[in-house]
Amino acid sequence: MFERNRYTIDQIDPEVFAAIQQENQRQEDHIELIASENYTSPAVMAAQGSQLTNKYAEGYPGKRYYGGCEYVDVVEQLAIDRVKQLFGAEAANVQPNSGSQANQGVFFAMLKPGDTIMGMSLAEGGHLTHGMALNMSGKWFNVVSYGLNAQEDIDYDALEALAQEKKPKLIIAGASAFALRIDFERIAKVAKAVGAYFMVDMAHYAGLIAAGVYPNPVPHADFVTTTTHKSLRGPRGGVILMKAEHEKAINSAIFPGIQGGPLMHVIAGKAVAFKEAQSPTFKAYQEQVVKNARAMAETLMARGLRIVSGRTESHVMLVDLRAKSITGKEAEKVLGDAHITVNKNAIPNDPEKPFVTSGIRLGSPAMTTRGFKEGEAVKVAHLIADVLDNPHDEANIAAVRAKVAELTKQFPVYA
């Protein structure tokens, strides 16, 4: 028997408890600008920390390989119904443990080793699961990549020509470092013309799409994959949305194809997050995410920094640091010293190595969750520019850190 007041983390494992407390304090004290990170609600965290973690539930609602699944069936069906409604999908699988596994589920269901796939080049903003040589997708399939034009938008004409030439089995849209709107309808027409399946990885944009502030790929794609964290602000996990005709193949690919028992406590967190995402406050939040990103980008450009593509139309932006004679790796470090958390990121045709880079990627979802609006976004952009103007001046770093502390104290994550 477990007595709740005796089996607490601080009593059982002080080392882990201390690390959790320190991470909690870091999240409160630092301004989080990593585009793929966000803060979940206490309700989502409570679902993830529930007794559902104890339950094995191989299979799907109403068709399990274990007994005692009547209540986890309720939870999973709620998650399925809510995410379908949220995005207007015909069918959904909420069991993938990550966005990468959601992508793998589509590959496993619809492709054979050696098939040709088309995805956005990682070097120009794509994701490693879309065909990077070291990733499973790059090892199992023949990969052809599309990229950007001179204006640093997707080169749709070149994409179409490449698809006509290579006749891929699957075309993938979606990115991890691309700030503009993606024309999903146009790519869908290309896929149809060459007889390819069309998959969209909307992991970065899912929250914006749910709120209607970014184009929805669901009406145009055979498959739409996503993570459930990032802009969607749920637990770490994945989802596959699909046309009804593909539901059986996808479900079989996830279980028993690439996964065993689903993580029911995480699926509960997904269900809660999907309900939160249906609220008017979530729509207002996503509208503010876009406003804050735009305010940051405009301020950084006014301070002499180049934004890749010249603007942002979403939550994310890439900052070209070459004019400041500082690498992405160095910028990540000095901004971190100032309690501003970013990640180094390659820019298109980056001359630096992947672990060095010439840029940083910034995103507005987490700071917007804190309650930041345009005024704070402008302040944050100025603080970033202040650090990058004098990256080795300790007094400058300390001054910025003090201003960050004022903002984070005014806008706590968890009040």
From Swiss-Prot:
Keywords carried by this UniProt record: Amino-acid biosynthesis, Cytoplasm, One-carbon metabolism, Pyridoxal phosphate, Transferase
CC cofactor: pyridoxal 5'-phosphate
Pathway assigned in UniProt: One-carbon metabolism; tetrahydrofolate interconversion; Amino-acid biosynthesis; glycine biosynthesis; glycine from L-serine: step 1/1
Family matches, as InterPro entries: PyrdxlP-dep_Trfase, PyrdxlP-dep_Trfase_major, PyrdxlP-dep_Trfase_small, Ser_HO-MeTrfase, Ser_HO-MeTrfase-like, Ser_HO-MeTrfase_PLP_BS, SHMT-like_dom
Matching PROSITE patterns: SHMT
UniProt-annotated binding residues for (6S)-5,6,7,8-tetrahydrofolate: L122, G126, H127, L128
A Pfam family annotated for this UniProt entry: SHMT
GO BP annotations listed: glycine biosynthetic process from serine; tetrahydrofolate interconversion
Disulfide bond entries: none
Catalysed reaction equations from the record: (6R)-5,10-methylene-5,6,7,8-tetrahydrofolate + glycine + H2O = (6S)-5,6,7,8-tetrahydrofolate + L-serine
SUPFAM superfamilies per record: PLP-dependent transferases
Entry's localization field: Cytoplasm
GO cellular component: cytosol
EC number: 2.1.2.1
UniProt site positions, description: Plays an important role in substrate specificity: H229
EC primary class: transferase
Function, in words: Catalyzes the reversible interconversion of serine and glycine with tetrahydrofolate (THF) serving as the one-carbon carrier. This reaction serves as the major source of one-carbon groups required for the biosynthesis of purines, thymidylate, methionine, and other important biomolecules. Also exhibits THF-independent aldolase activity toward beta-hydroxyamino acids, producing glycine and aldehydes, via a retro-aldol mechanism.
Subunit structure: Homodimer.
NCBIfam families documented for this protein: PRK00011.1
Protein name, per record: Serine hydroxymethyltransferase 1
Annotated organism of origin: Ralstonia nicotianae (strain ATCC BAA-1114 / GMI1000) (Ralstonia solanacearum)
